[in-house]
Amino acid sequence: MKTLKKIIVLAVLVGMIFTSCKKDSAKSSSSLRVKIHASNKTFSLLKAGSLTPGFAWDTCYMNVSKVELEAEKKENESSQDSTNIEFEWKGSKKVDLFGINSLIGDISLQPGVYDEISIEIEAFKSDAGSSPVFYLSGSYTNATEIKIPVVVIVNDDIQLKVESKEGTKLNAVNDYMTMINLNLILLMNGILKSDLDSATRTNGKIVISSTSNNSLYTKIKGNFDSCEDSEFDQD
């Protein structure tokens, strides 16, 4: 099956705040919590240079199989020597991307300073079973104010690769959280009003999948490469 790849640049919030619970300086490890969230649940569509009524999404989930972290680790800030390390979390887990708690999993970090960080998230059809790897549903409102149900079903393997900005460092005396935002506006980039008005409907619903409205599916599938929106903060 085809693999969808995505590079997301992490934005580092410099003004990090300490958590309400004080950390024990002698603790054996810290953690990096990895979350995924879908942003922009409602937005308009482009028609001949102007915006028209568009999408309102109500359900979005992904079946995540694995999270891998790779980084360069130093014992402390002044150390000149570094070691390439890898950590791994394995699921699978169905994550509600519109939910308050969209946590995928926690990666344990041994004490030290980490930079050149990359996080790889993989979602395999073999782990999803009868469920989609990625699922998005809601409605499309056309120019005459008629709401039409829309469903996007991705059953290909998905691989998301997250890379930190140059200069980003994690000091593992603290816990951290990375929030990966899938920007739904960017995911639907290139989908026009005319595309949806002419789309095939199944029982009154626009189903976008590998077997239904394939041209729209191909556009959306390609857009996973450019949904670049994320946050990185101390937990």
What is the role of each PLM region?
Residues 22-235:
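A short, solvent-exposed, low-complexity linear motif enriched for acidic/polar residues
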Residues 1-8:
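Bacterial N-terminal signal peptides that target proteins for export
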Residues 17-20:
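C-terminal motif of bacterial Sec signal peptides marking the signal peptidase cleavage site
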